[in-house]
Amino acid sequence: MSTPTTPLSYKDAGVDIDAGNALVNNIKSAVKRTRRPEVMGNLGGFGALCELPTKYKHPVLVSGTDGVGTKLRLAIDYKKHDNVGVDLVAMCSNDLIVSGAEPLFFLDYYATGKLDVEVATAVVKGIAEGCVQSGCALIGGETAEMPGMYEGDDYDLAGFCVGVAEKEEIIDGTKVQDGDALIALASSGPHSNGFSLIRKVLEVSKADPEQELAGKPLIDHLLEPTKIYVKSLLKLIEEHDVHAMSHITGGGFWENIPRVLPEDCKAVVKSDSWQWPVVFNWLMEKGNISEFEMYRTFNCGVGMVVALPADKVESALNLLNAEGEKAWLIGDIAKRSGDEEQVEIL
C-alpha cells in the first residue's frame, strides 16, 4: 500500500466546489426574477418551500418531469447553450397547462463530468427565462459534477415542475364531444422532440447545419427554443370552456391527441389548414421521411391543440392572437366507431 506524498482534495478527484459556488453567485439575479409571492425562504436551503395560492378553494397539485433529449447533443456540439434551459421548462410547464394547472415552481438537475461555470450559467439563465415565461418560480436544483460519468463537455438536464389547479376545473378530456372544434397553436420549430431523427437526417444527407435556410442558419431553425403556451392558455381557460388540450411532443399527432379524447371520439385534422414551417419540409425531403412518420415524430408546426365548443372558435382565436399566439381552426371532433383510429388527417 502506498500513500500520496501530498494530501489529496476533492478537486484532485475532479469535483470543484469553488466552481459550484461561483455558479450559484452567477445565477442569483436570474433566479430572483422568477420569484412568486408564495415562495418562502431563499435559494440554497436543504428544501425549497412554497405555499399554495390562497385563491384556490380545492387545490390539486399537478406535477411533471422531462428533459430536452438529444437536442442537447446539437446544442453542445455547436456551443449554443442559451436556449436549452427554456426548452427544459417548456417541456414540463406545457404538460401541466394541459390539465388547466398553473405552474407554481420548478427545479432543475444539471449533470456533467467537469463543471464549466460559463456554460452552466448560460443554461440556468435559460431555465430562469423559461420560468419567467411560464410564471413559475425556480426554487431549487442540483448541479452534479461527476468525473468519469460524462465525456468531455457533455452534460444532461432534467426538470421538475409542480402546478396547481382547482379540483372542479381540471381539464381531463371528459367533456370532449362530437362537433367540438379543434384549434391549433403554432410551434416555434421542432421544439424538443425528434432530434435523434433530425441528427440522423443531418448524418445521411451530409448537410452543413450552418447552411442558410429561409434567411437563417439551419442550426438556428433546429435549436429555436420551445414555445411556452402557459400564460396565453391560462387566459383562454379563464374566459372559455376548454374541453381538452394536447401538447404535441414525442409521438406527434398520432400519439398525443388520443391521450385526451374519450374512446368514442376522434380528431379530424385538416392538413390544408396550415403550412408546415420550412424546417419540416427540409427534414422530410433530405431524410426521405414519409408523411406518416413526420406526423408521428414531429409537431409539424403545431405545438398545442385545443378542443372547445364550435361556437366559441372566433372569440378563442381572437383572444389567442391578441396574446401573441398564431392560432387557427385545424379541425373538429367526430364520433368514432369500431376500430377507427382516433386521429384522422385529411
Swiss-Prot record:
InterPro entries in UniProt: PurM-like_C_dom (IPR010918), PurM-like_C_sf (IPR036676), PurM-like_N (IPR016188), PurM-like_N_sf (IPR036921), PurM_cligase (IPR004733)
Keywords tagged on the record: ATP-binding, Cytoplasm, Ligase, Nucleotide-binding, Purine biosynthesis
Pfam families hit by this protein: AIRS, AIRS_C
Record GO cellular component, one term: cytosol
Associated pathway: Purine metabolism; IMP biosynthesis via de novo pathway; 5-amino-1-(5-phospho-D-ribosyl)imidazole from N(2)-formyl-N(1)-(5-phospho-D-ribosyl)glycinamide: step 2/2
Family classification: Belongs to the AIR synthase family.
Catalytic activity from the UniProt record: 2-formamido-N(1)-(5-O-phospho-beta-D-ribosyl)acetamidine + ATP = 5-amino-1-(5-phospho-beta-D-ribosyl)imidazole + ADP + phosphate + H(+)
GO function terms (MF aspect): ATP binding; phosphoribosylamine-glycine ligase activity; phosphoribosylformylglycinamidine cyclo-ligase activity
Name of the protein: Phosphoribosylformylglycinamidine cyclo-ligase
Localization in the cell: Cytoplasm
EC number: 6.3.3.1
UniProt key word Ligase: yes
GO terms, biological process: 'de novo' IMP biosynthetic process; adenine biosynthetic process
Lineage: Bacteria, Pseudomonadati, Pseudomonadota, Gammaproteobacteria, Alteromonadales
Ligase as UniProt keyword: yes
Gene that this polypeptide is encoded by: purM
Broad EC category: ligase
Primary localization: cytoplasm
Organism: Shewanella piezotolerans (strain WP3 / JCM 13877)
